[in-house]
């Protein structure tokens, strides 16, 4: 294969360096796909990126048991009832066909959520897939929660991840965004709060702008999900 050809050329370079008395202290060449599929490319180190997130570099390599470690979550900030024939979001790109309950999610392209998901993506609310209504705006996205029982302001929203046994993979979000999962993971905005977990215990809460002073809300949310999963 082309990858093995490149490894052979790299080996030849290392041999030429060694012949001149030059030996790099560490040698590395393999990304996630190379680590999984090209044993000769492992050397001293490997540079796994996507695999470190528990994701596969391609569908053909799904034989390694990996579990996604990252999710993107928010909460409904508004729930409104609209009649049939009402327009939702900018430019009247969505019109309700029935009496519809709309959930407003405080995430938009300003947070790194792709505008291309307008009228085509989904989010999880109440363990159900809810379609995006109209355009994704800079700070808000609307979803159809008509069929979600007892939906209310404050309910959790999953933009990618798992909720109530239902999965919304980041790969699906990437496909709807006409890009790769790599880019989705890398383009989540700086102001989005990150909750870091080690061995089922929250260890840090921050944004990429700085440390977050108030840990309580994201930590409480995580502990609630962890305990519910353990009870199930």
Show the residue positions of the predicted features.
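Active-site loop/helix belt of alpha/beta enzymes
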Residues: 1-75, 79-83, 149, 205, ...
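C-terminal accessory subdomain/extension
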Residues: 81-232
């Amino acid at each position: 294969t082309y990858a093995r050809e490149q490894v052979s050329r790299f080996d030849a370079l290392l041999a030429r360096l060694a012949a001149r008395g030059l030996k790099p202290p560490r040698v590395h060449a393999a990304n996630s796909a190379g680590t999984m599929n090209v044993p000769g490319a492992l050397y001293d180190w490997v540079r796994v990126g996507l695999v470190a997130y528990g994701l596969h570099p391609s569908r053909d390599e799904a034989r390694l048991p990996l579990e996604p470690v990252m999710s993107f979550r928010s909460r409904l900030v508004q729930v409104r009832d609209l009649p049939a024939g009402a327009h939702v979001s900018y430019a009247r790109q969505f019109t309700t066909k029935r009496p519809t309950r709309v959930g407003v999610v405080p995430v938009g392209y300003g947070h790194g959520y792709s505008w291309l998901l307008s009228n085509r993506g989904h989010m999880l609310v109440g363990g159900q897939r809810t379609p995006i209504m109209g355009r994704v705006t800079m700070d808000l996205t609307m979803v159809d929660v008509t069929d979600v029982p007892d939906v209310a302001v404050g309910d959790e929203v999953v933009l990618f991840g798992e909720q109530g046994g239902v999965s919304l993979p980041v790969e699906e979000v990437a496909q709807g965004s006409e890009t790769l999962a790599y880019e989705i993971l890398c383009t989540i905005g700086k102001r989005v709060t990150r909750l870091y977990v080690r061995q089922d215990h929250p260890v840090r809460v921050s944004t990429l702008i700085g440390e977050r002073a108030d840990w309580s809300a994201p930590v409480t949310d995580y502990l609630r999900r962890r305990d519910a999963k353990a009870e199930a």
